[in-house]
Amino acid sequence: MAVLALVDGRRGLLAAAQMALTGLTALLLYRLLKRWTRRPRPFRACPGVIAHVPPLDEFSFPSGHTLQAVSFTVVALAWYPLLAPLLLTFTALVGASRVILGLHYPSDVIAATVIGSALGALSLWLLPLHVLVA
């Protein structure tokens, strides 16, 4: 995100600031939801499911990686729509990887996608581009 200010000047700085603020909000929301739901991870609850990498925390719901990737992508695409092929592919791979690695249930990833989309949309509604750039 820091590169945006160098590449796109003031506009890039504003985009990076909005992405950072949205990301921080996503992190806080993710932590609250994890503590509230306390859903065990698939590799702990389902025999035969193997965690291929160690988890960053104890609980499964929602997928923090997916929530961050989706909220970032929603905001980034509003600023830089030409990056859609790259960002949408990246975000889809993040979501799929969480299930493939045995760290999340598909519902964790789906819920994180919905929450991240809503959070990104809320960020764009509260801080619309035409107001920020004007």
What do the predicted segments below correspond to?
Residues M1-W36, I50, Y105-A134:
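Terminal transmembrane helix and immediately flanking juxtamembrane interfaces
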Residues R35-P47:
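Membrane-helix interface/capping segments
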Residues P47-A134:
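Membrane-embedded catalytic cores of phosphoryl/pyrophosphoryl-handling enzymes
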